[in-house]
């Protein structure tokens, strides 16, 4: 674990980290999360009968778009030239609900954990938005980074 917060300077003020001297390397991050819902709501989504349309398709696109906007949403986050963002949404009858996984990749000087987390978060929020009319008890949770690769600190898995 690092000994200090990198986005705070010596005086305690917010600071955008200078990554200009870092080498460009292939980097990737994977994040996950889930939306718990009633089994009836899950069935409605999987059958394509939600009033707002294709929940899974819309949520996937929203997550990809959100990853590309991470620097606009998170203060001090570097704007990145992502080379890939992939969002997977899988039904889980035992949850019950939808499990979301996002992969973000680039060749650059800083990691893509925030982009993967943003993709998962907005995907889950979109699922919630599109199904809230039929299920007021949905719960978003478990959002975390599960792996990262590349850069000076190397590879990591949860």
Curated annotation (Swiss-Prot):
Residues reported to bind substrate: 76-78, 114-115
Lyase found in the keyword field: yes
Pathway: Cofactor biosynthesis; molybdopterin biosynthesis
Catalytic activity line of the entry: (8S)-3',8-cyclo-7,8-dihydroguanosine 5'-triphosphate = cyclic pyranopterin phosphate + diphosphate
GO biological process: Mo-molybdopterin cofactor biosynthetic process
Keywords noted in UniProt: Lyase, Molybdenum cofactor biosynthesis
Active-site residue numbers: 129
Top EC class for this record: lyase
UniProt keyword annotation of Cytoplasm present: no
Enzyme Commission identifier(s): 4.6.1.17
Molecular function GO terms recorded: cyclic pyranopterin monophosphate synthase activity
Transmembrane segments: none
Function: Catalyzes the conversion of (8S)-3',8-cyclo-7,8-dihydroguanosine 5'-triphosphate to cyclic pyranopterin monophosphate (cPMP).
The protein's assembly and partners: Homohexamer; trimer of dimers.
HAMAP family xrefs: MoaC_B
Family membership noted in the UniProt record: Belongs to the MoaC family.
Protein name: Cyclic pyranopterin monophosphate synthase
Gene name for this UniProt entry: moaC
């Amino acid at each position: 674990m690092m000994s200090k917060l990198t986005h705070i300077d010596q005086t305690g003020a917010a600071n955008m980290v200078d990554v200009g001297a870092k080498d460009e390397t292939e980097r990737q991050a994977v994040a996950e999360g889930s939306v718990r819902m009633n089994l009836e709501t899950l069935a409605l989504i999987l059958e394509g009968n939600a009033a707002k349309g294709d929940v899974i398709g819309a949520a996937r696109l929203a997550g990809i778009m959100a990853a590309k906007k991470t620097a606009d949403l998170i203060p001090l986050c570097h704007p990145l030239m992502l080379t890939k963002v992939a969002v997977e949404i899988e039904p889980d009858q035992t949850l019950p609900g939808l499990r979301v996984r996002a992969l973000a990749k680039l060749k650059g000087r800083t990691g893509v954990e925030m982009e993967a987390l943003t993709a998962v978060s907005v995907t889950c929020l979109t699922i919630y938005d599109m199904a809230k009319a039929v299920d007021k008890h949905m719960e978003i949770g478990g959002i975390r980074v599960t792996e990262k690769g590349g850069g000076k600190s190397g590879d990591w898995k949860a």
